[in-house]
A protein has these predicted regions:
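TPR-repeat structural position
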Residues: 190, 248, 393-394
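Short coil/linker segments at helix-helix boundaries
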Residues: 156-192
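Short, surface-exposed recognition loops and adjoining beta-strand edges that mediate ligand/DNA contacts
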Residues: 36, 66-79, 159-166, 210-300, ...
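Membrane-proximal, proline-rich intrinsically disordered regions
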Residues: 21-71, 411, 450-482
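Hydrophobic-face positions in mid-chain alpha helices that act as interaction patches
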Residues: 47, 228-229, 250-377, 409-410, ...
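Inward-facing hydrophobic residues that define packing positions of alpha-helical scaffold repeats
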Residues: 49, 115-118, 190, 197, ...
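Conserved, well-structured interaction surfaces
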Residues: 85-157, 184-187, 204, 366-372, ...
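Bacterial Sec-dependent N-terminal signal peptides
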Residues: 1-30
């Protein structure tokens, strides 16, 4: 088989149409180019990256399944209440159900396919056919992205690092081929992730001092860096990784590298939340993706207004949300801007409207609003808050309050959160208040080993590996992992 370079057309491939990885690799899809042609110029590399980002943004991955779809359903944030729906089985953690296994398979396969596309870029960067100072920067972007993609997998398919670092991790893929990937322990997987991130940090050190979207829609690859895996996305991902490992000093260090870069990042004012509730989240977006279809897919999923059927997906009950967003203690008297911006009453249930409140709004959205957020600034304050508490509770509370105050709330005091247990419980609530629809709540619940309410608020789900560790797809052994 002639090797092919993955071009933008790959973003149009349907995972459901790919019966096996081997067949996929034996076919040259329409719209691909031979390697020697594809990677004969910088533009060829740029196009390959656009193909990677376009594939990530599809509903099969970050456009839905990895964000407001399957992963947020695991956190009980959303779901259909129809007894026959996959959603009900997902939220019951029935990982042996065929329809749930199909979700897991599609997530796993889709993520590794994107990783293989990144690996193809990296393989060609090892022996380029021309010289350019940009080639090393492209390598940094690709390495950082490979680490980011693996980290999202290990958070779902392996034990939490602090509770099971010597247990089975995931395959870490270094090749375009989807077969014969070495399986590492959790600790070994994290070592590979950090190795890629360290090199990405080194290679991107001289660029990305301004991270923005450049809403003029410039075609320059080196503008609009907020929709590329930029240097500050590397810092933010390292903060996430070190947080997961329990390395508080490093987690705080890298989160602070982001929050200190006020030239690009600043929390919205307490009266300006509307400007950051969705993409492009100006001033708060660290890494996101353009997507022409995201808002339409969102409207189709959340705005059909039919509760109790497969036609509509509802959020937590009003009583659960009122409890989550309740303002108590020293903060009493203020209003959390997020609840009304994210949810509304529809008959007997709550509708999630964070990214669009109607199908018409989704359709009419400007090009600059057509995208999704993957890493945002508030999370960097949450990471600092957790990391600093043991050594400096006052600084930890200040970090937490910066986000709260930007969302319209008054500051909490130490008397509101007198113990570390209380503080961490409040942090979990903040993830749930701030990040619905982004796929970050389930990993946070796992990290904090926290109990949580089911979708309708009828029962409390206790943390366990049987919930937090997804099973590998049944077909995975056929791909030759070792």
């Amino acid at each position: 088989m002639k090797k092919t370079a993955l071009y933008i057309a790959f973003g149009a491939l349907s995972l459901a149409a790919l019966p096996s990885c081997n067949k996929f690799l034996d076919v040259q899809p329409k719209g691909t180019l031979l390697q020697e042609v594809q990677f004969s110029s910088l533009q060829g590399y740029y196009d390959a990256f656009y193909g990677v980002y376009g594939t990530m943004a599809k509903s099969d991955l970050y456009g839905q399944r990895m964000t407001n779809g399957f992963v947020d359903e695991l956190a009980q944030m959303f779901g259909s209440t129809s007894a026959t729906s996959t959603s009900v089985k997902t939220r019951a953690y029935n990982y042996t159900d065929v329809s749930v296994q199909a979700e897991i398979y599609s997530l796993w396969l889709g993520q590794y396919q994107v990783i293989s596309y990144v690996n193809n870029i990296l393989a060609n960067l090892e022996s380029p056919s021309f010289s350019s100072s940009h080639l090393s920067q492209l390598k940094g972007e690709a390495l950082g992205l490979r680490a980011f993609l693996h980290f999202d997998l290990v958070r779902l398919f392996a034990e939490d690092y602090q509770r099971g670092k010597d247990s089975r991790g995931i395959p870490y893929s270094y090749d375009f081929n989807l077969k014969n990937r070495t399986v590492y322990t959790v600790a070994g997987t994290y070592e590979n992730i950090l190795k890629d991130l360290d090199e990405a940090e080194r290679l991107l050190s001289d660029i990305d001092e301004t991270v923005s979207l450049d809403l003029s829609q410039s075609t320059d690859f080196w503008s609009r860096r907020a929709v590329h895996f930029n240097k500050y996305a590397v810092y933010a991902t390292k903060a996430r990784v070190y947080q997961a490992m329990g390395n508080s000093a490093k987690a705080a260090e890298y989160a602070k590298k982001v929050t200190d870069h006020t030239a690009s990042f600043k929390l919205a004012g307490r009266n300006s939340f509307e400007s950051v509730r969705r993409f492009p989240a100006t001033g708060e977006l660290i890494f996101g993706l353009y997507s022409n279809s995201f808002l339409d897919d969102f409207a189709n999923r959340f705005l059909k207004n039919v509760a109790g059927t497969d036609e509509g997906v509802q959020a937590h009950s009003r009583s659960v949300l009122d409890q989550l967003y309740a303002v108590t203690g020293a903060a009493a008297g203020a209003i959390d801007n997020r609840q009304a911006a994210f949810y509304r009453n529809v008959d007997a249930y709550q509708q999630f409207i964070r990214f669009a409140s109607s199908s018409e709004e989704a359709t009419a959205a400007a090009t600059a609003q057509r995208g999704l957020t993957l890493i945002r600034l508030p999370e960097m304050y949450y990471i600092q808050a957790e990391a600093l508490y043991s050594s400096d509770p006052t600084a930890a509370l200040a970090a937490l309050n910066k986000v709260r105050e930007s969302r319209g709330l008054n500051a909490l005091t130490s008397s509101d959160l007198p113990t570390q247990v209380d503080f961490k419980a409040e942090l979990v609530k903040e993830y749930m208040r701030e990040m619905p629809g982004e796929g970050q709540i389930f990993p946070a619940l796992k990290h904090f080993n926290s109990s949580f309410l089911d979708l309708l608020g009828n029962s409390t789900i206790q943390p366990s590996s049987s919930i937090f560790v997804l099973p590998w797809p049944q077909d995975e052994l056929t791909y030759g992992n070792k």
